[in-house]
Amino acid sequence: MNQHVKVTFDFTNYNYGTYDLAVPAYLPIKNLIALVLDSLDISIFDVNTQIKVMTKGQLLVENDRLIDYQIADGDILKLL
């Protein structure tokens, strides 16, 4: 089983762009967001720990993991 998925992170709600990334599928959303922000050197204060999966219409929150919601390569994850 692949431990990473290739997704697009959309930070346009925070005046940042979109980024194509390979991210770990097994981390809780709150840890994943922190990891991605740190890796991209993006500073967002009061970051929301909710992600909308634009390609599937799902909402993921703090303790949800990508692997549990069948998030796959090519999905678009928008930080709310």
From Swiss-Prot:
Function description: Seems to regulate secreted factors that contribute to the establishment of persistent infections in the host. Negative regulator of EsxC. Not necessary for the production and secretion of EsxA or EsxB.
Domain of life assignment: Bacteria
UniProt organism field: Staphylococcus aureus (strain Newman)
Pfam families on file: YukD
Family membership: Belongs to the EsaB family.
Chief place of localization: cytoplasm
Deleted gene: phenotype: Deletion mutants display only a small defect in acute infection, but remarkably are unable to promote persistent abscesses during animal infection.
Entry protein name: Type VII secretion system accessory factor EsaB
Subcellular location: Cytoplasm
One GO cellular component, as annotated: cytoplasm
SUPFAM superfamilies xref list: Ubiquitin-like
Gene: esaB
Regions that span the bilayer: none
Keyword annotations of the record: Cytoplasm, Virulence
